């Protein structure tokens, strides 16, 4: 299968304002005594600023799979359709935990496993994990003339042969899952159609699923996050009524695109802030693909990059899922997978953080 090439932004770093501090210039002895009594009373009453346990009722995920007290951790693990479970288990062994979300791709071909949402392997993996299915309006082994266009999808031309069939499979699966239609669609216009045609196609699939009684889809709109495409993003957004989560895919490409080395914070912050200011102030956000190239001249660089992940995700308001991309992109220097044991150990430590260990749906 062919995976999309991802543009990269020149994202600036994070600039955080210091918290305001109040200074007390004069306090009488009597007032100080009152304050001390109040502090002691608070301590004795058990008041605490500590975060609630992931097992507490207030931290249970919502119907739209939003963890209330932290974030999910997931990954795209390199696989072919028949060996998904084996490769997921091998990845989990190295990071020391079960993935919350497993990320897979599908096209709209009419035969074989590539066009079949929820393969037997995905259903096996999905017993203990959530799934993010990336559904692309492509036929990876087809000719240019066979590639679906957004206008065709919007007009219902693929309903009987593709849309209805896959809707039925998802409905039969029953469990909630994340579904993305044409992730990184900002790289596919005008080849697949106009932004307006994409929106019409997305809405048609959404509405068709609803007509067919499919209620277990969490609709996930995923863009590159490349800030140079900001005007495209505005025109490609299907609207709040059609989107449950917003995702974006940003990397430290480094030598892959002859870019400067960027920290995890630098790769994520500009896109996050732009989405919050221009697309949605309240939708849950997903770092649907993140990762970094290696730096052979500094073997510790990749490990140090992953060390930042928990700290940065916690301060990116509204980010409730982060998925590591453990594969390569096309081109020289574009291997974004974990390169050495030190990198694996760093990621293992990062995803052991309690923030990434929330109670799953149905637990």
Question: Which residues fall in each region the model found?
Answer:
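Substrate-binding cleft of extracellular glycoside hydrolase catalytic domains
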Residues: 111-221
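Aromatic- and acid-rich polysaccharide-binding/catalytic face
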Residues: 99-107, 133, 233-263, 325
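N-terminal substrate-binding region of glycoside hydrolase catalytic domains
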Residues: 59, 64-158, 292, 324
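Glycoside hydrolase catalytic-domain groove-lining segments
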Residues: 117-136, 251-293
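Acidic (Asp/Glu)-rich catalytic clusters
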Residues: 89-97, 115-133, 165-174, 235-241, ...
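Aromatic-lined carbohydrate-recognition surfaces of secreted/lumenal glycan-active proteins
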Residues: 76-77, 182, 206-231, 282-295, ...
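Substrate-binding cleft of secreted/luminal carbohydrate-active enzymes
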Residues: 56, 62-79, 177, 284-363
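C-terminal region of N-terminal signal peptides and the immediate post-cleavage residues
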Residues: 37-59
């Amino acid at each position: 299968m062919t995976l999309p090439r991802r543009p990269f932004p020149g994202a600036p770093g994070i600039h955080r304002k210091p918290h305001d501090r109040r200074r007390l210039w004069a306090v009488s002895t009597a007032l100080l005594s009152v304050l001390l009594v109040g502090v002691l009373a608070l301590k004795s009453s058990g008041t605490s600023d500590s975060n609630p346990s992931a097992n507490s009722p207030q931290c249970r995920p919502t119907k739209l799979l939003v963890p209330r007290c932290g974030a999910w951790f997931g990954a795209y693990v390199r696989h072919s359709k028949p060996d998904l479970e084996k490769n997921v288990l091998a990845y989990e062994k190295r990071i020391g935990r079960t993935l919350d979300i497993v990320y897979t791709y599908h096209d709209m071909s009419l035969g074989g496993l590539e066009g079949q949402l929820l393969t037997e392997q995905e259903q096996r993996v999905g017993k203990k994990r959530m799934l993010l299915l990336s559904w692309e309006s492509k036929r990876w082994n087809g000719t240019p003339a066979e590639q679906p266009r957004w206008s065709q999808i919007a007009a219902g031309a693929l309903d009987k042969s593709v849309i209805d069939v896959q809707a039925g499979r998802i409905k039969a699966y029953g469990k909630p899952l994340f579904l993305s239609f044409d992730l990184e669609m900002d790289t596919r216009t005008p080849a697949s159609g106009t932004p307006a045609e994409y929106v019409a196609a997305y809405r048609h699939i959404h509405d068709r699923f609803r007509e067919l009684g499919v209620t277990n889809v969490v609709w996930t709109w995923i863009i590159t996050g490349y800030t140079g495409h900001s005007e495209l993003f505005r025109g490609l957004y299907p609207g709040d009524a059609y989107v449950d989560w917003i995702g974006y895919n940003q990397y430290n490409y480094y030598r892959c695109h002859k870019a400067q080395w960027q920290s995890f914070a630098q790769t994520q912050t500009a896109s996050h802030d732009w989405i919050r200011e221009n697309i949605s102030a309240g939708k849950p956000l997903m770092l649907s693909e993140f990762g970094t190239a290696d730096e052979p001249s500094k073997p510790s660089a990749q490990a140090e990059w992953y060390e930042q992940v928990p700290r940065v995700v916690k301060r990116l308001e509204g980010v409730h899922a982060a998925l590591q991309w453990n594969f390569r992109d096309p081109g020289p220097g574009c291997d974004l997978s974990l390169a050495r044991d030190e990198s694996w150990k760093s990621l293992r430590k990062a995803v052991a953080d309690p923030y990434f260990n929330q109670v799953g749906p149905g637990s």
